[in-house]
Amino acid sequence: EVTKVDAKVLKDMEDTMKEHNGIGISAIQIGHPIRVFLAGSPPQVFINPTILERSSYTKVDWEGCLSCPGAHVRVRRSHSIKVKYTNEEGIVIKRKFKGFDARVIQHEFDHLNGFLITDRGKVYQE
């Protein structure tokens, strides 16, 4: 479990995400095997996230990934989720997300558990 995240790691994550026009990035994608990701615009920090609830209503949509350049995959995700995480100030938060935000968070959460979009569906290459 992560207790403190180096500010330089967070800056490197944010810079990499912006450089590649991403909407999320996990620490593992830049070589830091810790349970941390950024998601959204402006990016929010998610430390030790846990998905507490997932809606039974799901939706399939296209996803891309900084780890799979040029690949696009149709992925089924829950439309709404409830997440528990710690922010960069060390505050534990429980919050619901839906739609696109929920999709991005589930995508980044997958990275923390060793999954890529290519594990979730048929790959369409650009």
PLM feature segments, named:
Residues 1-126:
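Positively charged
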